[in-house]
């Protein structure tokens, strides 16, 4: 029996994607080999690789100006790879500080140039409860790029409208909310996302890059770290994480089969309404620190009156078959991660549990 998985990542995968992998694990398409045993330059794997790119391109409406890349190293590598490619000594880039992960990206940029904090919504206690307003941004037109983190898993905030950054390329870490809904890819110079939330398993990092933007990248860095190297070689410059990309393909095929990103957005908004509804019904018991306009659809955070009640909530939920609810060590409390593989019914079950928990423990 499978549990209801609210882990923040690696997160649950859609059951049809896992079942497809199970059925094809030993003998992939009659080849007598597992997909993970095939050469990354062989016909069998090439079909998977190209299908994954094609599915994502269609689902998201990626224009010809942009290219899909499959890399490794996670978002943490991208924190360094972005400035490595686009910052030069003496140059600056603007960073929008909205949480721990944007702080980490900012720190990596210091090795290559002069990152600048264009805005920070950190409170005196170093917590974040909102994303900034457009009028709070202090952007420089000479910046090499503007970097933001679209969703903040630890503190539960999310950009619901991306900022206007003028003619400066916008770079976004979308690791924790990529594909929760559709959006205009053409607005971005580069998007990166670790796969292990909404897209697949850990081990592969998705990049969607503006071809003209990455063409301006530095050439005095190792080839393996140049975006152009991977673009020119269809993400096959070195051996890619073939099994992870195969599972990404399965997840993308599932998204297409259920109705695409419009259907996912509908489900995700319904899930958020259910869970925040349970929180807001009991505001003295479930204390949600995030300002309403900045509430994340993917990661809902709240605290109970005491740490002991937090622990009881997690333990009781586990007995009911729900796991992954303990908050990040930085924030404490409870964190509910509702990525695409979490169903509306899963969240309805948790919301009912929350109402019952208040009655018995409140």
Swiss-Prot record:
Localization of this protein: Cytoplasm
Q: Name one Pfam family in it.
A: Aminotran_5
The entry's L-glutamate-binding residues are 41
Tell me the route in metabolism or biology where this protein functions: Amino-acid biosynthesis; L-serine biosynthesis; L-serine from 3-phospho-D-glycerate: step 2/3; Cofactor biosynthesis; pyridoxine 5'-phosphate biosynthesis; pyridoxine 5'-phosphate from D-erythrose 4-phosphate: step 3/5
UniProt KW keywords: Amino-acid biosynthesis, Aminotransferase, Cytoplasm, Pyridoxal phosphate, Pyridoxine biosynthesis, Serine biosynthesis, Transferase
Which Enzyme Commission number(s) are on file for it?
A: 2.6.1.52
> Which reaction equations make up its catalytic activity?
O-phospho-L-serine + 2-oxoglutarate = 3-phosphooxypyruvate + L-glutamate; 4-(phosphooxy)-L-threonine + 2-oxoglutarate = (R)-3-hydroxy-2-oxo-4-phosphooxybutanoate + L-glutamate
Principal place of residence: cytoplasm
- Transmembrane residue ranges: none
Q: Which SUPFAM superfamilies match?
A: PLP-dependent transferases (SSF53383)
BP terms from Gene Ontology = L-serine biosynthetic process; pyridoxine biosynthetic process
Query: Which PROSITE patterns does this chain map to?
Result: AA_TRANSFER_CLASS_5
* Bound cofactor: record note: Binds 1 pyridoxal phosphate per subunit.
> Which cofactor(s) does the record list?
pyridoxal 5'-phosphate
Instruction: Name the top EC class.
Output: transferase
Q: Where does pyridoxal 5'-phosphate bind?
A: 75-76, 101, 153, 173, 196, 238-239
**MF terms per GO, please?**
O-phospho-L-serine:2-oxoglutarate aminotransferase activity; pyridoxal phosphate binding
Residues bearing PTM N6-(pyridoxal phosphate)lysine:
197
Give any Gene Ontology cellular component: cytoplasm
Oligomeric state and partners? Homodimer.
Family to which this protein belongs: Belongs to the class-V pyridoxal-phosphate-dependent aminotransferase family. SerC subfamily.
PANTHER family with a match to the protein in the record: PHOSPHOSERINE AMINOTRANSFERASE (PTHR43247:SF1)
What the protein does comes down to:
Catalyzes the reversible conversion of 3-phosphohydroxypyruvate to phosphoserine and of 3-hydroxy-2-oxo-4-phosphonooxybutanoate to phosphohydroxythreonine.
Official protein name in the record: Phosphoserine aminotransferase
What organism does the UniProt record list as the source?
Myxococcus xanthus (strain DK1622)
Q: What gene name does this entry carry?
A: serC
